[in-house]
């Protein structure tokens, strides 16, 4: 993660990272809404602490960059696990938007990796929940998905879900991946 000097760009990936670089442009004073979708199933056990740290670092970099005032940036968090009967705790857990990085850090600290039960998880439910969040009307919107598994109902013929329960709410929406 790096701020590019004398540039309106905040790069959210480490150099040489095994990821697609995410670039947060700040050319205009439009508000920014950034939502993190965090897999909290048991398979995330070895990774959840570093995922929480990476999210905190991203929020700190964006908030501390001085390129956007506090009232122009909001962060959201949705934790997701799996659909019953594989997991009975929750499918999604929504924390809503906040401009306060300390609140975001408290929300992140509450995440515990547990449950799941099969390979695919409830990413489509998390995406559907993200679509229904209280987005600022004129905000530039970004969703960052953090997971190690494929979603139920999309491309997994033997996962027991012929179609994701939330896929219909995603149909017709435009996503950049």
Q: What spans do the regions from the language model cover?
A:
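Divalent cation-coordinating acidic motifs and surrounding scaffolds
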Residues: 1-177
